[in-house]
A protein has these predicted regions:
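Zinc-dependent metalloendopeptidases
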Residues: 1-278
Length: 278
């Protein structure tokens, strides 16, 4: 299909050249996608879920998936479903260990600490510098903003895109590291929104598939820190998603909602008061 190929090449170029999704002139919402400048192979599982693969790494938008997670997803069908606790392991004792790569400046570290404190203040999670018992996150400035889903065991990566990120980006990616999925891929989303596939950049279409499993909340939350905005990954400045009445919304990257709190508490248990990070 020559037309489809040319559109794909154009969309890859758009993703590489543009680090800002089209949201609002007053709010910086940066692209959240893994391996921004690399061409990915597309993989469609038998249950319809589309993933990408770069070298040996499975990717769904800005989520990195382990071989074990993909194997589990491939075995599950829509009717049976899958729980979030099956799909992503939680962090032991509610403590997330992390280290900074050498390319993360002190200024950047302070922004990241602020984002961590937002989660600590809202939920029952503690962030601590170090490698713990061997399961930890290395935070890097890299080729895209992305994270593994939950704790995968050993060292894992949380990347912030070298071309642009902010505190809200960190809050979003930390949500994935804790085990949260995208709100706009919630199995109930079609009751609340319309996805305009023709307006989505082709390389980003896997970010708009419904995940019929892995959600810890039955409520759909437009303000979730894990929700994309109406113009995310638009190829033509038209909305990729609208509410049922045709209106649009801007992604929240400023605060953690009550529903976000409930999701994390469903995963990790009761609330713990925040302590000093470090």
């Amino acid at each position: 299909m020559p037309l489809e190929k040319s559109l794909l090449e154009a969309d890859i170029g758009a993703l590489v050249k543009s680090t800002l999704s089209v949201e609002s002139d007053s709010v910086n919402i940066y692209q959240e996608i893994a391996f921004e400048s690399l061409v990915k192979d597309t993989i469609r599982l038998a249950n319809g879920l589309q993933l990408s693969k770069v070298n040996e790494q499975y990717v769904c938008g800005d989520i990195l998936l382990s071989d074990k997670q993909v194997e589990l997803l491939a075995k599950k069908n829509v009717s049976r479903g899958i729980s979030i606790s099956e799909l992503s392991q939680i962090w032991q004792d509610k403590v997330v260990y992390f280290v900074f790569a050498s390319n993360v400046s002190l200024k950047d570290q302070n922004i990241i600490y602020d984002a961590m404190y937002e989660w600590e203040s809202a939920c029952n999670i503690l962030f601590r510098v170090g490698q713990g018992s061997g399961d930890y996150i290395e935070i890097i400035i890299g080729n895209g903003s992305y994270s593994n889903l939950g704790r995968i065991g050993g060292k894992q990566t949380l990347s912030l895109f070298i071309a642009g990120w902010n505190k809200g980006t960190v809050m979003h990616e930390l949500g994935h590291a804790l085990g949260m999925l995208h709100e706009h891929q919630h199995p109930m989303r079609d009751n609340y929104i319309i996805v305009n596939e023709r307006n989505i950049q082709i390389p980003a279409r896997d970010q708009f598939d419904i995940w019929p499993y892995g959600y810890a909340s039955s409520k759909f939350d437009f303000d979730s820190i894990m929700m994309y905005g109406s113009y995310a990954y638009s190829r033509n400045n038209q909305p990729t998603m609208t509410k049922k009445d045709g209106t649009t919304w801007t992604a929240n990257r400023s605060y953690i909602t009550f529903n976000d709190q409930l999701v994390v508490m469903n995963l990790y248990g009761h609330y713990l008061p925040p302590g000093p990070i470090g």
